[in-house]
Regions:
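Preference for protein termini
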Residues: 1-180
């Protein structure tokens, strides 16, 4: 027997698939019906198979902490996140706007430094950062684009609103896994 959606509760968390116990969101009904047809054992086997493929393909990421480089397998939930098209269109536009703002920030840091002069960000926070690259001062990349790609980690709050947990501009490795 599959998942009993009538008894399922996401507690205080927003659920992208289920709006209330037993009620799938319109755009997730097909997936919910399919998942409901699988037993817990079948779901577990599918997750294990995905984990094995990821490990065998060497899909991993490195956690850099305290001088250690720890390789970890890339986590993949076999249940996809389904996001309504209209909602995703809004999020995508916001992410594009965010990347433009990040590029403007980096360009300012390495050129005019208006953000420092205006007292918005303390000089020492930027200038003493181990990630601040003094040789980049004065560089003006084409169109002011320092980062062509950004890995923004999205989460939802309890009301279902998207929030950016962090932006990864250095090495947004997750994107390359999607290309694989």
């Amino acid at each position: 027997m599959g998942i009993n959606w009538k008894e399922y509760s996401s507690g205080n968390f927003y659920d992208e698939l289920i709006s209330s116990p037993g009620n799938a969101r319109i755009y997730a009904r097909g997936l919910i019906a399919y998942l409901g047809s699988l037993t817990a054992g079948e779901m577990e086997l599918r997750q294990q198979a995905a984990d094995i493929v990821i490990r065998e393909m060497g899909i991993s990421f490195t956690v850099y902490s305290d001088g250690e480089n720890i390789d970890r397998s890339w986590p993949l939930d076999i249940i996809p996140r389904i996001i309504d098209y209209k909602e995703w269109t809004t999020v995508a536009e916001g992410l594009k706007q965010r990347l433009k703002a990040l590029n403007c920030f980096i360009n300012d840091v390495y050129n005019e430094q208006q953000i420092i002069q205006d007292g918005i960000v303390p000089a020492e926070l930027i200038l003493k950062s181990r990630n601040f690259l003094r040789p980049c001062c004065g560089i003006k990349p084409p169109h002011g684009v320092w980062a062509n790609i950004c890995g923004s980690d999205l989460v939802r709050d309890d009301k279902g609103l998207f929030c950016v947990l962090e932006d990864n501009l250095r090495v947004p490795s997750g994107v390359s896994y999607m290309m694989e």
